């Protein structure tokens, strides 16, 4: 579990007097770290009792071609670039903004697989 509340330490190292304790709403979760593999999703309870779908592994992506306006489900071959972290390329992690190689060519991921549960991408010309 991650606690994402405000720190009780000042920049100088002194302490703020805590006005209250920790709250359940301030707890975070570990990142999904979606990678290429047989489809696997996880349901997570979120604020208000809603459900968020996390993609843990994915095989296919919905790739849109902006010039023709056609969207197709294609197989993901590998991750070629990832500006978020160079190590994600080696580990084949899928994040928003990553450039993947598909059957149609290179595509940039536009969705957040760990938040949305799907992988939407657009072809890079």
Swiss-Prot record:
Is this entry keyworded Plastid?
no
Q: Which residues form the signal peptide?
A: none
**Entries under Pfam families matching the protein:** Ribosomal_S8e
Could you cite one Gene Ontology molecular function of this protein? structural constituent of ribosome
Q: Which InterPro entries match?
A: Ribosomal_eS8 (IPR001047), Ribosomal_eS8_CS (IPR018283), Ribosomal_protein_eS8_arc (IPR020919), Ribosomal_Se8/biogenesis_NSA2 (IPR022309)
Which cysteines share a disulfide bond? none
- Record's keyword annotation contains Zinc-finger: no
Gene3D superfamilies reported for this sequence: 3.10.290.70
Q: Which GO terms describe its cellular component?
A: ribonucleoprotein complex; ribosome
GO biological process assignments: translation
Q: Which UniProt keywords apply?
A: Ribonucleoprotein, Ribosomal protein
Subunit field text: Part of the 30S ribosomal subunit.
What protein family does this chain belong to?
Belongs to the eukaryotic ribosomal protein eS8 family.
NCBIfam families xref list: eS8
Name of the protein in question: Small ribosomal subunit protein eS8
Q: Which organism is it from?
A: Methanosphaerula palustris (strain ATCC BAA-1556 / DSM 19958 / E1-9c)
What gene is this protein a product of?
Answer: rps8e
């Amino acid at each position: 579990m991650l606690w994402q509340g405000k720190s009780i330490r000042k920049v100088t190292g002194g302490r703020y007097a805590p006005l209250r304790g920790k709250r359940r709403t301030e707890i975070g979760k570990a990142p999904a770290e979606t990678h290429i593999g047989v489809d696997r999703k996880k349901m997570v309870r979120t604020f208000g009792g809603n459900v968020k779908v996390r993609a843990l592994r994915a095989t296919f992506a919905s790739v849109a071609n902006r010039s023709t306006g056609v969207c197709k489900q294609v197989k993901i071959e590998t991750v070629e670039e990832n500006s978020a972290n160079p190590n994600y390329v080696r580990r084949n992690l899928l994040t928003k903004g990553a450039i993947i190689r598909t059957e149609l060519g290179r595509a940039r991921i536009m969705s957040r697989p760990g938040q949305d549960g799907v992988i939407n991408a657009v072809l890079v010309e």
